[in-house]
């Protein structure tokens, strides 16, 4: 089981890339009761509810003009999954990068239909 309680194939973490992250935090808090759980990196807000964290909200990167949600699918072995994705016709558009606080690693692929999807391998929780 992954750090956040996800297992292989689960749709887990979701991330909103938007033009105004702070305003989006306020909007979703008012709309559905999500709570801001912290800001582990400047401009990256973690949100959740009832003690659970399940997503992030951040500003678009320079040059990016398309606000969007990015789902992350949990995998047990990110390297093996990326290799398999490429063999099935996907392209890696963000190579593996470490999550803060030794949380694991993420990558983003573009599937054969052109859809960007995140993959995440979370580090195991210490008992």
Please describe what each predicted stretch is.
Residues 31-32, 76, 126:
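Generic alpha-helical secondary structure signal
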